[in-house]
Curated annotation (Swiss-Prot):
Source taxonomy: Bacteria, Pseudomonadati, Pseudomonadota, Gammaproteobacteria, Lysobacterales
Any single GO BP term: sulfate transmembrane transport
Protein name: Sulfate/thiosulfate import ATP-binding protein CysA
Entries under InterPro entries matching the protein: AAA+_ATPase, ABC_SmlMolc_Importer, ABC_transporter-like_ATP-bd, ABC_transporter-like_CS, Mo/tungstate-bd_C_term_dom, P-loop_NTPase, Sulph_transpt1, TOBE-like
Matches recorded under NCBIfam families: 3a0106s01
Keyword Transmembrane helix: no
Gene: cysA
Enzyme kind, highest EC tier: translocase
Length: 343
């Protein structure tokens, strides 16, 4: 089932959390809401879940208007950053909780509940741990229990609020791969919030970049990284160098060299060229630069250099096979891919 968000607005006193947000989440896709603190990503997720209500706009689940629908009626699975597991219940009962609290015709028979929990234990790879309590589990295992509990009610949509935020780096990486595989198995429409760029780019089918209550870009991970729609997206997703220039007659004068404009709609005048460290490469016809600092980092060589003509400091990332580079060494650098925006 898809989700359609239309002209959503949310205000907290004088703070605008969401400013006319419109967004379609496709059926079966895994969508990341990525942005800094205060960008509105968690507020948007909570409104989807029914935990907050918008001041204006509409939320549709499929063709059904869910804007004022209760949390229970929406049938969403929600996973919190800090698990929210019941400490006095073992793994089995935590997973079964949402099924046991149902009333009337919606209440399942005990045999069906048990079968569903056992199915989920296998799905999240926790067979044999059903009698353990949350305090006896690792952080990664607790998050799997939380996810199984969210899936137990057979939700129409799965929503995750920074699901790996409380875990250490290696566990996060392992769980990211596992969650992607799980999504492929279930095909459930899933939206997750994160401030971790790597997490969003690795996991999601599409990424919505939020900033100050607005969506700056909604696109595939590859296009978000390779073709950012704004200076904010360039700066927030990955590292970037900003080099001042002047656009005139379709050419950008940058550090004594001319570059073709990458944006034909851009008006003449001062501009900034945005280029990622890995897109600055040695080139005999490039900008003269002086190395200020160089450091090997695994398979990469990180270099900080000064463009001689402009005096701008830039960061360069080269393969370690580029050889030894030392401070004071002269280089020539060219931008193989870049974006241009008004200064």
């Amino acid at each position: 089932m898809g989700i359609r968000i239309s002209h959503l607005r949310k205000q907290f006193a004088s703070f605008t959390a969401l400013d006319d947000i419109t967004l379609d989440v496709r059926q079966g896709e895994l969508l990341a809401l990525l942005g800094p603190s205060g960008s509105g990503k968690t507020t948007l997720l909570r409104i989807m879940a029914g935990l907050e209500h918008a001041d204006g706009g509409q939320v549709l689940f499929g063709d059904e208007d869910a804007t004022r629908m209760s949390v229970q009626s929406r049938r969403v699975g929600f996973v919190f950053q800090h698990y929210a597991l019941f400490k006095h219940m073992d793994v089995f009962e935590n997973i079964a909780f949402g099924l046991r609290v149902r009333r009337g015709k919606e209440r399942w028979a005990e045999a069906r509940i048990r079968a569903r929990v056992e199915e989920l234990l296998a799905l999240v790879q926790l067979q044999g741990l059903e009698q353990r309590y949350p305090t006896q589990l690792s952080g990664g295992q607790r998050q799997r229990v939380a996810l199984a509990r969210a899936l137990a009610i057979e939700p129409r949509v799965l929503l995750l609020d920074e699901p790996f935020g409380a875990l250490d780096a290696q566990v996060r990486r392992d769980l990211r791969r596992w969650l992607r595989e799980l999504h492929e198995q279930t095909g459930l429409t899933t939206v997750f919030v994160t401030h971790d760029q790597e997490e969003a780019l690795e996991l999601a089918d599409r990424v919505a970049i939020l900033n100050r209550g607005r969506i700056e870009q909604l696109d595939t991970p590859a296009r978000v990284y390779d073709t950012p729609a704004s200076p904010f997206v360039y700066s927030f997703v990955g590292a970037v160098n900003r080099i001042p220039g002047v656009l005139a007659h379709g050419q950008i004068q940058v550090a004594g060299h001319a570059l073709p404009s990458a944006n034909p709609a851009l008006a003449a005048g001062p501009v900034e060229v945005y280029v990622r460290p890995e897109d600055l490469v040695p080139d005999a016809d490039g900008w003269p630069a002086t190395v200020a600092w160089a450091q090997r980092s695994g398979a990469r060589l990180r270099v900080r250099a000064i463009l001689d003509a402009a005096g701008n400091e830039v960061e360069v990332e080269l393969p370690a096979s580029a050889g030894t580079i030392t401070a004071g060494q002269q280089l020539r650098l060219a931008a193989r891919h870049y974006g241009v925006f008004p200064a």
